[in-house]
Amino acid sequence: MTTPAADLAPQPERPDRLETERLILRDFRLEDTEAVHAYGSDPEVTRYMPWGPNSPEDTAAFMARVLEQQATWPRLDLSLAIELKAEACVVGSIALHLRDIRNASVEMGYVLRRDLWGQGIVSEAAAAMTSLGFRLGLHRIAATCDVRNTGSYRVMEKLGMRREGCFRQDRQLRGAWRDTYLYAVLAEEWAAGRR
């Protein structure tokens, strides 16, 4: 049985840096602002996102928010920069957003620079974050995406998430209603799939 997130004591090692074969997932730094703005201002990258394309002011506000959140522990939102080791620069971000403390449930979100799509980078980062979440005692990790965002829901399916539903016209995106897929994976499903 997993422990509700509210009962978790702060971990001896804060999960502000994870390393995979090709990536470093780490806290943001002020000097990442230009790289963050490069992907956050790209209309194609933000096409299905509920935010963006970002202005320089939007990016500055995002950076101020994540840098402030990084100063606290435990965090309700664990947003990490995705750094590609080969480039030694930030190419995207990934986050776990605490949605339900009592039931140890979070929502995962991610974004990646367009020239790196289709290379398994988000899948690699998402697997590391999912493992971390369950090691920290989470029970359920969910993710949502616009139904037209095939790249995003393929990442969710690679993680072993199940499509739990489709919310019809649940939000407006740039003046038009969109449908949203909901995917999730439970701790025991993740453990069974990783044996």
Give the role of each language-model region.
Residues 1-47, 64, 79-195:
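Acyl-donor (CoA/ACP) binding surface of acyl/acetyltransferases
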Residues 40, 49, 70-72:
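Hydrophobic residues in alpha-helical segments
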Residues 46-54:
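A short gly/proline-enriched turn/hairpin at secondary-structure junctions
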Residues 55-76:
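Active-site rim helix/loop that mediates acceptor-substrate recognition in acyltransferases
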